């Protein structure tokens, strides 16, 4: 089997596996697959989210109420395939960086 056929077969299997995923349990992973985001972009975003979440917790404990700079960093770091609201919602639903993502969702909803 040549390389192209093997790649096509692998893509077919991935599509089938994706259909088996419960999107309610893993909405962020589903979003990554649907949008065909690259591994290195997602790894970079997750590292950034860890840092932003830590910063959010500290700033919130200090009494800060405005987190526009954190949202701006998050939004600018997203690959073009991912929309900020959809991504924050998927991360929160999957239980990742929940306080930070909920804050982002509130901020976006307020406009």
Annotate each PLM feature.
Residues 1-31:
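Long, leucine- and charge-enriched amphipathic alpha-helices
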Residues 3-6, 10, 38, 45, ...:
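Intrinsic-disorder-associated interaction segments
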Residues 17, 24, 56-59, 63, ...:
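Short secondary-structure junctions and interdomain/linker hinges
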Residues 23-75:
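Amphipathic alpha-helical interaction modules
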Residues 74-111:
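Amphipathic alpha-helical binding modules
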